[in-house]
């Protein structure tokens, strides 16, 4: 049995944010052969579920690793089987850092986004992530449980996010990590989680040898799982800094079924 962990945006999904029919056919063939699929994303769980259902991949044999590996959901049993959260004291501290720096910070429940305002950043974000928005200046007082992550968003100024990242790592590196998933998005989550930690935990849970694991991605928040997997796959359209860590670089982009070709050659071949 082999297991494929794949990022969504710019990896599994094409430029229309869809799983192409061809890629879906290849994935279903992979599942029919007894292999496993993990949709591994920085997105919140509700959004990953939406992608899986739209692609008709909300089926046994598929797992959803959301919030950068902080939450793993098993479709077959309808259960969250693994989770790492951010303590509320740290939610408050990061939120207030963002406010002081004039940076949009948001956080999540499994079904909603908590945003400080209905601003340009949340309007941009919800074009792709279709979850309801709760406007809140103090989400740590309103959330029913600790969140899996926070997200800092700056639409036009990555440098501001770099400064925030350095501040978070200087002050809270005992508990938090902060990694870019794009030039606009800084992911902030429990330092003991991450896509790579989620990969290692699930392989152990399913008794699958790491050498039989594959991880595909395109951005820096995919690095930990690309390194952790027995076979790291980087999309040819991915950031150049990832290429040295890849055992496999796709010949085609996410918009040309690049991942499907790798599945056919390396998992089904």
Where are these regions (language model features)?
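Residue-level signal for inorganic ion chemistry
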Residues: 30, 41, 68, 150, ...
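Active-site phosphate-binding/coordination module
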Residues: 21-122
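Conserved acidic, metal-coordinating active-site core of Asp-based
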Residues: 97-216
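Short, well-ordered alpha-helix to beta-strand connector turns
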Residues: 1, 34, 61, 147-148, ...
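Mg2+-dependent phosphoryl-transfer enzymes with acidic/Ser/Thr/Gly-rich catalytic loops
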Residues: 1-3, 20, 187-269
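Non-catalytic pre-domain segments flanking phosphatase-related domains
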Residues: 1-6, 25-28
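Conserved ATPase-coupling elements of RecA-like P-loop NTPase cores
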Residues: 15-19
């Amino acid at each position: 049995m082999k297991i494929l962990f794949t990022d969504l945006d710019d990896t599994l999904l094409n430029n229309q944010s869809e799983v192409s029919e061809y890629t879906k056919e290849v994935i279903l063939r992979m599942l029919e052969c007894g292999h496993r699929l993990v949709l591994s994303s920085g997105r919140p769980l509700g959004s990953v579920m939406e992608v899986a259902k739209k692609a008709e991949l909300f089926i046994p044999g598929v797992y959803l690793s959301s919030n950068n590996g902080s939450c793993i959901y098993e479709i077959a049993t309808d259960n969250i089987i693994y989770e790492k959260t951010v303590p509320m004291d740290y939610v408050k501290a990061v939120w207030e850092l963002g406010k002081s720096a004039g940076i949009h910070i948001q956080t999540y429940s499994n079904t909603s986004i908590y945003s400080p305002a209905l601003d340009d950043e949340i309007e941009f974000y919800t074009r792709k992530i279709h979850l309801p928005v709760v406007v809140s200046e103090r989400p740590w007082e309103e959330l029913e449980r600790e969140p899996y992550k926070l997200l800092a968003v700056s639409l036009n100024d990555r440098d501001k996010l770099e400064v925030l990242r350095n501040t978070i790592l200087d002050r809270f590196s005992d508990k938090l990590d902060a990694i870019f998933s794009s030039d606009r998005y800084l992911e902030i989550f429990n330092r003991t989680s991450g896509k790579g930690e989620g990969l290692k935990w699930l392989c152990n849970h399913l008794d699958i040898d790491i050498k039989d694991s594959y991880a595909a991605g395109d951005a820096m928040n995919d690095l930990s799982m690309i390194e952790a997997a027995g076979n790291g796959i980087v999309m040819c359209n991915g950031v150049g800094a990832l290429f040295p860590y890849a055992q496999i670089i796709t010949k085609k982009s996410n918009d040309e079924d690049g991942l499907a070709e790798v599945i056919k050659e390396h998992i089904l071949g």
